[in-house]
């Protein structure tokens, strides 16, 4: 594993996001987009014809190349390493395949009976290829923008690992929460341990921010407040505390973002978990978010479908969103990942609309 403390990376030129998180005023509102290196880009689609999804994730040179695609094409204020939240289940011994038009499929889902078979020893070490991709990308960015690392949150990963992929109900994984609580906590602890080690690996490799996704397929949305408090909150808090403690030991400053899609019921509690930024989906108004979170730094929350609007419409929706949040303590993003059929032109307009806001 590359150790950041022994690296000499180029100085950062665009620190808008980091300034906002520190409470300083940037020259322009910062913006990046979840899945910004993705199928909406023709260049990415051509690249995918040559390489499978996990081949890209597991090959540092390829992951670096894809990560840089949107940075070279657009005026984004951050890059996010090209990877997937399911690399952790892979490291634990699950067989994960990305099927076209289906999404991820896990051939050997976790059950109560095979829980002991997870290969927990050295799991994070088996993800060194992500660290290598981060180091390579950080160098090739040459300080243009900061680089974000990420991981899936424990409940999100648990859902995939038990269901064997995405689900309309998550009934198999929720069954554990009601009928097999001891085993559920055991699996969540296993995942939390690996996530912490994995995030530190990313920091040591050069990640300048970290995002935790409790969001894929609306996983937090499938829980009520009671379940979120018991099966998400303690583990999310432990991740924030332990990762931040280890970052401090490294004498580094790496902010952490929590994005728990569909968890409006827990926004006030999320503020106390120790994350620097709270990600917001598009199904709650910015004004309501500010009433709940006050001056907490937030990230979001344009409806991805707003990018289907006319250029004038996109600008109007951006203005309305920013009016609700205010220009302070805000990192602009979509309320979830960008969709494959969206246009690069719409993304350009989105970015320009954000950067044109007078602070």
Residue ranges and their predicted role:
Residues 2-100, 136, 315, 344-359:
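N-terminal basic, low-complexity leaders that serve as flexible interaction/assembly modules and, when applicable
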Residues 126-359:
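Active-site loop segments of alpha/beta catalytic cores
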Residues 13-17, 43, 52, 114, ...:
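Exposed alpha-helical structural elements
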Residues 11, 60-61, 124-127, 185:
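Generic detection of long, well-ordered alpha-helical segments
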């Amino acid at each position: 594993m590359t150790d950041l403390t022994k690296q000499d990376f180029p100085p950062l030129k665009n620190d808008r996001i980091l300034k906002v998180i520190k409470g300083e005023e940037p020259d322009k509102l910062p913006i990046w987009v979840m899945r910004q290196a993705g199928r909406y880009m023709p260049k990415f689609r051509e690249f995918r014809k040559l390489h499978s999804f996990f081949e890209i994730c597991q090959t540092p040179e390829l992951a670096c190349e894809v990560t840089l695609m949107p940075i070279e094409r657009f005026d984004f204020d951050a890059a996010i390493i090209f990877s997937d939240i399911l690399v952790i289940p892979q490291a634990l011994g699950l067989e994960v395949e990305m099927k076209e038009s289906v999404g991820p499929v896990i051939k050997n889902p976790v059950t109560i009976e095979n829980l002991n078979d997870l290969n927990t020893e050295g799991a994070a070490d088996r993800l060194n290829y992500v660290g290598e991709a981060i180091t390579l990308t950080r160098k090739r960015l040459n300080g243009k923008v900061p680089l974000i690392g990420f991981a899936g949150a424990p409940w999100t990963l648990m859902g995939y690992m038990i269901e064997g992929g995405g689900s309309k109900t998550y009934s198999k994984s929720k069954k554990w929460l009601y009928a097999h609580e001891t085993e559920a906590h055991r699996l969540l602890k296993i995942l939390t341990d690996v996530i912490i080690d994995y995030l530190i690996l990313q920091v040591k490799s050069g990640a300048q921010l970290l995002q935790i996704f409790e969001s894929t397929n609306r996983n937090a949305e499938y829980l009520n407040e009671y379940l979120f408090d018991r099966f998400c909150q303690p583990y999310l808090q432990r991740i924030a505390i332990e990762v931040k403690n280890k970052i401090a030991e490294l004498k580094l400053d790496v902010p952490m973002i929590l994005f728990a899609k569909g968890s409006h019921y827990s926004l006030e509690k999320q503020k106390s978990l120790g994350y620097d930024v709270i990600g917001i989906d598009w199904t709650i108004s910015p004004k309501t978010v500010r009433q709940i979170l006050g001056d907490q730094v937030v990230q979001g929350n344009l409806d991805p479908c707003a990018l289907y609007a006319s250029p004038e419409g996109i600008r109007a929706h951006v203005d309305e969103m920013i009016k609700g949040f205010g220009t302070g303590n805000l990192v602009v993003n979509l309320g979830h990942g960008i969709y494959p059929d969206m246009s690069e032109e719409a993304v350009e307009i989105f970015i320009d609309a954000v950067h044109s806001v007078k602070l």
